[in-house]
Amino acid sequence: MLKNFMKNKKGAVGIGTLIIFIALVLVAAVAASVIINTAGKLQHKAAVVGQETTQQVASGLQVVKITGHSVDQYNLDKIAILVSPNIGDEIDLATTVVTFSTDDRKMSLLYDSSNASNGGKVRLSTANGTSDIFKYDDVYAIGAWPFEDPTYGQSDQDPNEKKFGIVVLQDMDNSVSGEHPTVNYGDKVLLAINIGNIVGENIGNRIRIQGEVVPEFGAPGIIDFTTPPVYANRVVALQ
């Protein structure tokens, strides 16, 4: 009888050990599941942050050149900013902001998407080029230059709106349209700014102008120039 009792006791101890072992396995499995889920979330977050960082570092716009249009020796009425995107993701110019500041004022300009279905404030010159980037082009409904132009015609733009238009110089995949003016690496466009109408008066001589062309994400293009003492020619290199 004693021998049978000892056998039963050993069996009970073995079952208890097995239960403890199973419990440990279950706890370890739950812990492993939590760790795996956490690692997955952290990996996803790291990938998103890495992608956003890449966009901020690699993407953006660079100001290649700035040219002005003078009406006489002392007055500048238009500015054309030649921009091109950096290597990186495409840039939507519809969400791009152009800032200007002088000694006594600062302004922010947005893309003029009015009448976008008919081309908006975009003039395409990629096919045949253009004889005059500052010319108001009524072939494209309103043309790239906002506001009234007494020389070449008129637009229905409200002078109180701070807007810019676009002249397309190079766009191999036709990504720049009135509704979605999107540029990618290799594209070149002019941001058409009728500065005289926006400010309310033409820009005089020896005026320091600073600003940025700020895309939705990525590095901004820098604007920094001083207008010359005299506008000797109708077309003036500013930066």
From Swiss-Prot:
GO biological process terms, semicolon-separated: archaeal or bacterial-type flagellum-dependent cell motility
Residues of the propeptide: 1-11
InterPro entries listed in its UniProt record: Flagellin/pilin_N_arc, Flagellin_arc
Posttranslational mods: N-linked glycans consist of the 779 Da trisaccharide beta-ManNAc(Thr)-(1-4)-beta-GlcNAc3NAcA-(1-3)-beta-GlcNAc.
Keywords tagged on the record: Archaeal flagellum, Glycoprotein
Residues bearing glycans: 115, 128
Subcellular location: Archaeal flagellum
GO cellular component terms given for this protein: archaeal-type flagellum
A GO molecular-function annotation: structural molecule activity
Family: Belongs to the archaeal flagellin family.
Function: Flagellin is the subunit protein which polymerizes to form the filaments of archaeal flagella.
Name of the protein in its database record: Flagellin B3
Species the sequence originates in: Methanococcus voltae
